[in-house]
Amino acid sequence: MENLNLEMTLGAGLEIALVIVGLLIGIVGFVSFVISCWLAVKYTKFNHIENSVHMTGEEVARKVLDDHGLEKIKVKVTGSLMFGNSYSHYFKKVRLRRMTRHKTSLTALGMGVQKACLAVLDKEKDPDMKKQIRLYPMITFGPFAFIPLILVGTALEYFVFNQSGTCVYVLGGLGLLFYVYAIVLSVLTLRTEKKAQERAYIYLQEKHMATASELEDLRELFRLYNIQYINDIILASLELLYNVLQIAIALNKGSSKK
């Protein structure tokens, strides 16, 4: 009887914790939405401001690459949804959005330099960049790389609440591994992006390609990107905790029935 009461108390505590974490996920998710909207506003605003050197995103990226002996790295246009502004180690190319590549805007200047600086970090064998490349070859596919994570998370939620025994352990463990994997990669991505941003500021200053005002605007833009990365890490961590609690509740219910 005492064991039963203990299991019931533990189960109630886990249920309360699950609700609290669920609410936190909702709050952080809302904050993430607000940040994304604000980032889109700033990105668009700066994309309508002419940069002082009148260079397109492609021209700027090409210059950075050539100045660092990376002539073999290509600069390609990409759609906004699949790849976005990014650098691919495996395909040896810097990808810029259509709205960025051919524009002589402040956004184009910042994105062109910063993404090219990722290639420079790769060439210099930056430790965080090396870890990111080793752990995540799918980084090439941008947001679509997280589709398996979403699918596994959905499957986890279904099976944990509808199955028992082996399914809970196998799918639960698999789902948790995906979340841990995503968190580690998000941290590495944040580190490499920040390093590339700092390299971009230094390059623009040394080459006299941006005014003090432009550099401040770019810092504001990249700061929002970094906040978004941090927010995503927090969200993924909460989702990991949420799924741990789901598994714990399922296992507690299973033991109560025995």
Enumerate the language-model features and the residues they cover:
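Polar-ligand-bearing catalytic/cofactor-coordination segments
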Residues: E2-E7, S36-G142, V187-K258
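Hydrophobic alpha-helical transmembrane segments
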Residues: A12-I27, F159-L177
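Alpha-helical transmembrane anchor segments and their immediate juxtamembrane flanks
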Residues: A17-G26, I147-L151, E239, Q246
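N-terminal signal-anchor transmembrane alpha helix
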Residues: G22-T44
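Hydrophobic alpha-helical membrane-associated segments
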Residues: I27-I35, L176, V180-T192
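Membrane-helix exit/interface motif
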Residues: L121-P127, L149-V160
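Long, charge-patterned amphipathic alpha-helical coiled-coil/hairpin "stalk" segments used as oligomerization
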Residues: M129-T154, V170-L174
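Membrane-embedded alpha-helical transmembrane segments of multi-pass integral membrane proteins
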Residues: F146-L149, G153, F178-L185, L238
